[in-house]
């Protein structure tokens, strides 16, 4: 009978582990809790949830921003940049443009469907761009592989497509209609502010494509308050809140100990 009880307990533990693993992962693009190809679970980075008192000289990554910045947060970023901190904004949708304007930057993200013949894949949206600017982010690197980046205007160009590139407006994978070959900038900088038109460089499937770039970026902080690295999964958010709230973690630990204490108390009374 005791052996059967242990077998049932083992099955319950395995089932519970499977349910926990399923409940604490997500398929949301760019999420730190997404272990799939389009998640960022494998990107080595420390999340920050407030822009106040960022460490001087650190590098802050704002990845695929999807939330507005308050005037106070813009002020924190200005102070951070002025103190020698580096900010890298990776955006392909143009959501970063209001922040760039508030920071007084002339850089803008122009969404589109950049494609190129400078590739070794059948997909015209997956291609190599040339390093054309001098920055520590691309030190020792000649080309970077990108995945359907947006065009970046203004600032000092850092990454540029080959001449055999075009904005594939009709999505047919070929130069047609009014489309023409041209070069396009996909990354530019102004001082310590850098804007990259391809947030997918940081997803799990792309990390191995540009290892030197990822290495040059380290160590890096991620702005978890405005980036799409979070999740809408309530279970994951609850667990994250407990981990970040010492009082809640201590309370749960106490609740976990209570049954054990009660069990040993009963044995002592018996």
Language model regions located:
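Short, surface-exposed patches at the edges or C-terminal ends of soluble domains, predominantly
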Residues: 1-270
């Amino acid at each position: 009978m005791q052996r059967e009880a242990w077998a049932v307990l083992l099955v319950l533990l395995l089932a519970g582990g499977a349910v926990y693993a399923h409940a604490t992962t997500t398929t949301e693009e760019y999420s730190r809790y997404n272990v799939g190809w389009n998640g960022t679970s494998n990107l080595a980075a420390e999340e920050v949830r407030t822009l106040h008192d960022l460490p001087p000289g650190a590098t802050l990554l704002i990845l695929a921003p999807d939330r507005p910045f308050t005037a106070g947060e813009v002020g924190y970023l200005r102070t951070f940049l002025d103190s020698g901190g580096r900010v890298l904004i990776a955006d392909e949708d143009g959501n970063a443009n209001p922040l760039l304007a508030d920071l007084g930057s002339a850089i803008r993200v122009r969404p589109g469907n950049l494609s190129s013949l400078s590739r070794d894949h059948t997909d015209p949206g997956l291609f190599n761009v040339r390093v054309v600017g001098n920055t520590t982010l691309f030190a020792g690197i000649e080309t970077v592989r990108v995945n359907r980046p947006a065009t970046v205007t203004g600032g000092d160009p850092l990454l540029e497509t080959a001449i055999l590139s075009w904005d594939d407006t009709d999505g047919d994978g070929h130069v047609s209609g009014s489309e023409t070959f041209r070069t396009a900038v996909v990354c530019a900088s102004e001082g310590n502010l850098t804007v990259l038109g391809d947030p997918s460089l940081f997803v799990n499937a792309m990390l191995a494509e540009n290892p030197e770039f990822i290495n040059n970026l380290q160590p890096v902080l991620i702005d978890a308050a405005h980036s799409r690295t979070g999740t809408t999964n309530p279970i994951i958010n609850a667990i994250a809140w407990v981990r970040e709230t010492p009082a809640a973690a201590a309370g749960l630990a106490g609740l976990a100990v209570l049954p054990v204490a009660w069990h040993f108390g009963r044995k002592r009374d018996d």
